């Protein structure tokens, strides 16, 4: 008699998930190396090598520094009244005017850079009793000696240099930036030749601040034929405040003011070429895409940029745990469901069914559970980017030599921030990966439990992700299980009958083994009894003597 399990009265249904031959290794909270079917790289590690001029307005400084453009160096006149989102200073920038220094260079550079404009308004300062528009052979404007266009070099008139006292109120509703300077002659002779007094003095004040500078006369290294220097200073005058300038010599006077603006403009040193392209994020190495949450191209950035981290690679799992299919198995030879391994070749879904019935074998994806997993995973990358992308710029820090300790402290703080963000990135990605794997495992379990609840006593869990269905289940029946319309009551009697027949036959087949074992045991027992009886009989007849020695 044929077993019911071996004819067309039963079917097998397995549930499984997608797998690939070679997955991607990711890190989770509980495992440093776990293989998944798919993962997305989160660290941008290369730039385009060029700076894109859109959507940010890029101003190429060419051979001018921002401060030279601010002061009005003759070869930087093209930058007058320019505006920018990002001013790019080049490595070949140089000065071509009277040698100068800015005691608070970094602050002035940062202030002007963030303002994003060199808009200049000339004002009518009155300088009585002195000669204006001084020039130098170190600052040629064409063939003639010249000077910074935004500054006015005042010298003696005849043999006198009177005390100057000039006021300029700010009657506007915006801040005004005044640039002025103090000339340090190289010799006492030069001092008296230019300013009469043996020692000058310059005081610039507002209601909020006051600066008094006394020239430091002395020879310095020769630069462009000059051993004297000019020190550049700056003063911000708030609305309603007044600028007061008092001097008896050595004054490099302002010609007007720069209109200050507040914004997100900045400055960056870079030798990358500027090209016509679109990129939200700019680094000194060039523009980089901002579709990843992290980057390790450069610490210095401008725009909406990924967060800088030390890692070269961080992979976000965008697929499920990968368990490659055992290639030695056939479709339904000895294969198992998801508990043992995944299935390769499922191109239309992440989860699905394989079946074997009277009509043959087949496979189909479960789109609902697949879509549920995909919907939750798709938002992960955007959420990570939202958490990490900076909508502001990280400017480069500059300090003078005397501020070495501050520079060291700043470097320590920046390095610590990078270390913290690198650690945070590791933890964040590991947590997201753990959640993804748990999520995809959960969807598989949900589908399995949903199928179990439908089949009830009509099928038996085989323990490997498959069900043995104890009734005839054609393709239409299999489809009803997949789409959730299966009615177990229709097949209940048939399933119970087949189950009892199969179990009964299996039980009868099992009795043969028990009978064999029991028969063998009884035979051994009887043999022992006969042997013992023979020995006792022989002892009584005297044919066998047994001596016991103590």
Curated annotation (Swiss-Prot):
Subcellular location: Virion membrane; Host apical cell membrane
Superkingdom in the source lineage: Viruses
All ranges on the Extracellular side of the membrane: 1-514
Post-translational modification: Palmitoylated.
UniProt-recorded Gene Ontology molecular function terms: host cell surface receptor binding
Topology of this chain in the membrane: Single-pass type I membrane protein
Lipid-anchored residues (S-palmitoyl cysteine): 539, 546, 549
Disulfide pairings: 14-466, 52-277, 64-76, 97-139, 281-305, 473-477
Residues flagged as site, Cleavage: 329-330
Cytoplasmic topology ranges: 536-550
Record: glycosylation sites: 8, 22, 38, 165, 285, 483
Keywords of this entry: Clathrin- and caveolin-independent endocytosis of virus by host, Clathrin-mediated endocytosis of virus by host, Disulfide bond, Fusion of virus membrane with host endosomal membrane, Fusion of virus membrane with host membrane, Glycoprotein, Hemagglutinin, Host cell membrane, Host membrane, Host-virus interaction, Lipoprotein, Membrane, Palmitate, Transmembrane, Transmembrane helix, Viral attachment to host cell, Viral envelope protein, Viral penetration into host cytoplasm, Virion, Virus endocytosis by host, Virus entry into host cell
SUPFAM superfamilies linked to this entry: Influenza hemagglutinin (stalk) (SSF58064), Viral protein domain (SSF49818)
One GO term (biological process): clathrin-dependent endocytosis of virus by host cell
Gene Ontology CC terms, in alphabetical order: host cell plasma membrane; membrane; viral envelope; virion membrane
A Pfam family recorded for this sequence: Hemagglutinin
Residue ranges of the TM segments: 515-535
UniProt function note: Binds to sialic acid-containing receptors on the cell surface, bringing about the attachment of the virus particle to the cell. This attachment induces virion internalization either through clathrin-dependent endocytosis or through clathrin- and caveolin-independent pathway. Plays a major role in the determination of host range restriction and virulence. Class I viral fusion protein. Responsible for penetration of the virus into the cell cytoplasm by mediating the fusion of the membrane of the endocytosed virus particle with the endosomal membrane.
HAMAP family found in the cross-reference section: INFV_HEMA
Other remarks on this protein: Major glycoprotein, comprises over 80% of the envelope proteins present in virus particle. The extent of infection into host organism is determined by HA. Influenza viruses bud from the apical surface of polarized epithelial cells (e.g. bronchial epithelial cells) into lumen of lungs and are therefore usually pneumotropic. The reason is that HA is cleaved by tryptase clara which is restricted to lungs. However, HAs of H5 and H7 pantropic avian viruses subtypes can be cleaved by furin and subtilisin-type enzymes, allowing the virus to grow in other organs than lungs.
Complexes and interactors: Homotrimer of disulfide-linked HA1-HA2.
The family this protein is said to belong to: Belongs to the influenza viruses hemagglutinin family.
Record protein name field: Hemagglutinin
Organism: Influenza A virus (strain A/Duck/Hong Kong/7/1975 H3N2)
């Amino acid at each position: 008699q044929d077993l019911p399990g071996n004819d067309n009265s039963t079917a097998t249904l397995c549930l499984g998930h997608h797998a690939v031959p070679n997955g991607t290794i990711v890190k989770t909270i509980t495992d440093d190396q776990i293989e998944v079917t798919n993962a997305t790289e989160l660290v941008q590690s290369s730039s385009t090598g060029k700076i894109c001029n859109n959507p940010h307005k890029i101003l190429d400084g060419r051979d001018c520094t921002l401060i030279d453009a601010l002061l009005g160096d003759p070869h930087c006149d093209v930058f007058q009244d320019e505006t920018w989102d990002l001013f790019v200073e080049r490595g070949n920038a140089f000065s071509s005017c009277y040698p100068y220094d800015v005691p608070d260079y970094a602050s002035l550079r940062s202030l002007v850079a963030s303002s994003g404009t060199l808009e200049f308004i000339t004002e009518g300062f009155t300088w009585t009793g002195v000669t204006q528009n001084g020039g130098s052979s170190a600052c040629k404007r064409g063939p003639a000696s010249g000077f910074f266009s935004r500054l006015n070099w005042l010298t003696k008139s005849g043999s006198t240099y009177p005390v100057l006292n000039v006021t300029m109120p700010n009657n506007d509703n915006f801040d005004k930036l005044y640039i002025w300077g103090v000339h340090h002659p190289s010799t006492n002779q030069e001092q008296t030749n230019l300013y009469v007094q043996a020692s000058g003095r310059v005081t610039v004040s507002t209601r909020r601040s006051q600066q008094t500078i006394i020239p430091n006369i002395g020879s310095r290294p020769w630069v462009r034929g000059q051993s004297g220097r000019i020190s550049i200073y700056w003063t911000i005058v708030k609305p309603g405040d007044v600028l007061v300038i008092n001097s008896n010599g050595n004054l490099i006077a302002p010609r007007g003011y720069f209109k200050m603006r507040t914004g997100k403009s900045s400055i960056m040193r870079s030798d990358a070429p500027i090209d016509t392209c679109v990129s939200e994020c700019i680094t000194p190495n060039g523009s980089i895409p901002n579709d990843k949450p992290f980057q390790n191209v450069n610490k210095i950035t401008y725009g909406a940029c990924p967060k800088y981290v030390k890692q070269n690679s961080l992979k976000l799992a965008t697929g499920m745990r990968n368990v490659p299919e055992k290639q030695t198995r056939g479709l339904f030879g000895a294969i198992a469901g998801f508990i043992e391994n995944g299935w390769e070749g499922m191109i239309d879904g992440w989860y699905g069914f394989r079946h074997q019935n009277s009509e043959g074998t087949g496979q189909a994806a479960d789109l609902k559970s697949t879509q549920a997993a995909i919907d939750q995973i798709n938002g992960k990358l955007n959420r990570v980017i939202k958490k990490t992308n900076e909508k502001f710029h990280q400017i480069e820090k500059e300090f003078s030599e005397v501020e070495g300790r501050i520079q060291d402290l700043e470097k320590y703080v920046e390095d610590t921030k990078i270390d913290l963000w690198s650690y945070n990135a590791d933890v964040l990605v590991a947590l997201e990966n753990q959640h993804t794997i748990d999520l995809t495992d959960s969807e598989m379990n949900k589908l399995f439990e949903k199928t179990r609840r439908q089949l009830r006593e009509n099928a038996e869990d085989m323990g490997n992700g498959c069900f043995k269905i104890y009734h005839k289940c054609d393709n239409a029946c299999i489809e009803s299980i997949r789409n959730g319309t299966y009615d177990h009551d229709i097949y209940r009697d048939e399933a119970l009958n087949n189950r009892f027949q199969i179990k009964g036959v299996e039980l009868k087949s099992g009795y043969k083994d028990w009978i064999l074992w029991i028969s063998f045991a009884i035979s051994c027992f009887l043999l022992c009894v006969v042997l013992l009886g023979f020995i006792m009989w022989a002892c009584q007849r005297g044919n066998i003597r047994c001596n016991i020695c103590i």
